[in-house]
A protein has these predicted regions:
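N-terminal secretory signal peptides that target proteins for export/translocation
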Residues: 1-15
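Intrinsically disordered, low-complexity regions enriched for glutamine and histidine
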Residues: 13-16, 37, 162
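Bacterial Sec-dependent N-terminal signal peptides
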Residues: 24-53
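Short, surface-exposed polybasic-aromatic patches that bind anionic ligands, especially phosphate groups
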Residues: 48-261
């Protein structure tokens, strides 16, 4: 992996067919990709208890923007699939791109003497499960109502295909961000919520939610400028996570940008 000190975060454009690239500071990319959230104690999702087979073929092979071959379940393998088209900013190798002219100022604004802290791991941290979990569901997954308590005006309305036992970041008793991430593999849709609580009637309550189109560069067609999302920055969470199925391939297995905070 290369560390580019003047790399980027992305913010969604409204009604557009592209992403606006905002140079905001230091980010990490692999030669062809990478992915994780670096804010403690929110590292990437741990490996499944019974890992599915990693995607076939050599690292570098893969299917972009079509997740129909993904396995089902919590922490399931995508079997070589990647969210969004190959031309998407999340999947673009920027290792040969010129450094932004404002690189030094951006780095100084973040903190020149501050490093990056990787939060990889599995198991428990202070009694709570480590990582940001996700679950892959089929297109037949029942859709349920989601009540948004804080950012309804900036959320994509339900229903969402959320299983009642969908994994919650930090576990059911967590007092943290409580993200829920669900991938509908058959419809190529990503559903993300924050401060998520299952309700007795099968519905969910969350502070806000976003639906991303994994088969398009118009990743969130409903979004307006400055809208938030489950990560509070207008970005999807899932595309930047490091997953077991890709990391297990070794060098070259991660082919997307890394997420960190």
């Amino acid at each position: 992996m290369r560390i580019l000190l003047s790399t980027f975060l992305w913010r969604l454009c409204s009604q557009g067919s592209r992403l606006a690239l905002l140079c905001l500071g230091a980010a990490v990319v692999a030669c062809g990709g990478g992915g994780a959230d670096g804010q403690a104690p929110d590292p990437v999702a741990p490996a499944p208890a019974t890992p599915s087979n990693p995607p076939g073929g050599a690292p570098g092979n893969g299917t972009y923007g079509n997740l129909s071959a993904a396995a089902l379940g919590v922490g399931a393998s995508l079997n070589g699939a990647l969210p969004f088209p190959a031309s998407n900013a999340w999947n673009t190798n920027i290792s040969t791109q010129p450094v932004d002219p404002n690189s030094d100022a951006l780095i100084a604004g973040i903190g020149l003497d501050r490093g990056l802290h990787p939060d990889f791991g599995a198991g428990l941290y202070q009694g709570q499960p480590i990582g940001i979990p996700y679950v892959v569901v089929a297109g037949t997954q029942a859709r349920v109502a989601v009540q948004f308590t804080d950012y309804a005006s900036e959320s994509d309305p339900g229903p969402y295909p959320f299983p009642h036992n969908a994994p919650i970041e930090g576990g059911p008793a967590s007092s943290g961000d409580r993200h829920v991430i669900v991938i509908d593999r058959d419809n190529n849709r990503l559903y993300e919520t924050g401060n998520s609580y299952p309700q007795p009637d099968g519905s969910w309550r969350a502070s806000g939610g976003a639906v991303f189109h994994l088969d398009s560069n118009n990743v969130r067609p409903t979004a307006q400028p400055r809208w938030t999302s489950a990560d509070a920055a207008g970005l999807p969470i899932f595309p930047g996570l490091v997953r077991y199925d890709e990391a297990s391939l070794g060098p070259g297995g991660i082919r997307h940008a890394l997420r960190f905070t």
